[in-house]
């Protein structure tokens, strides 16, 4: 799955709220814990991230409800980054700069010194524990690091490049390639075949 596909899953959740407000009772916690839970012991910003990646079929470095534990696991697997954030990264925030991890989100866009992320358990008047999924824009200086997942790459290839690869690797002649290209989706098929052979 690509970053864009994952972000579509996350953005479809914007507006989901815990019920009742302030309870941490939300579908992501029910999925994660295997039962309905509520109370202050169940903040769910990281649980939301875990849920999104589960739906996308992308493995996380560790199953956890802790932002710090995810960042540490990402570091141990060589998948942590500090700076140069990009869409699809899971950023970890330290809002008060005390060295502890406070919150997380899935980066949707980066613009100069600002990051826009889709976050669980946030709200418009606070940084964390706000009770809903929202798109938030924050200063990059609040980020202590991020997990950079391994996404499937979307490769662009011209039809001519695809033809050459198929001819070289599959041993097909120019006539057969022309025949394939004549079908309704022939050029698209050739590009996909060539990408698989590459």
Place the predicted regions along the sequence by residue.
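Low-complexity, Pro/Thr/Ser/Gly/Ala-rich linker/spacer regions in secreted
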Residues: 1, 149-160
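N-terminal capping segments
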Residues: 1-58, 150
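Extracytoplasmic/periplasmic, Sec-exported soluble proteins
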Residues: 1-2, 37-45, 80-83, 99, ...
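...with weaker cross-activation on analogous glycine-rich loops/strands in unrelated enzymes
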Residues: 2-4, 58-125
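Short, solvent-exposed alpha-helical surface patches in non-cytosolic proteins
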Residues: 46-51, 156-198
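Short helix-capping/linker segments at secondary-structure and domain boundaries
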Residues: 56-60, 197-198
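Active-site signature of cysteine proteases
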Residues: 112-152
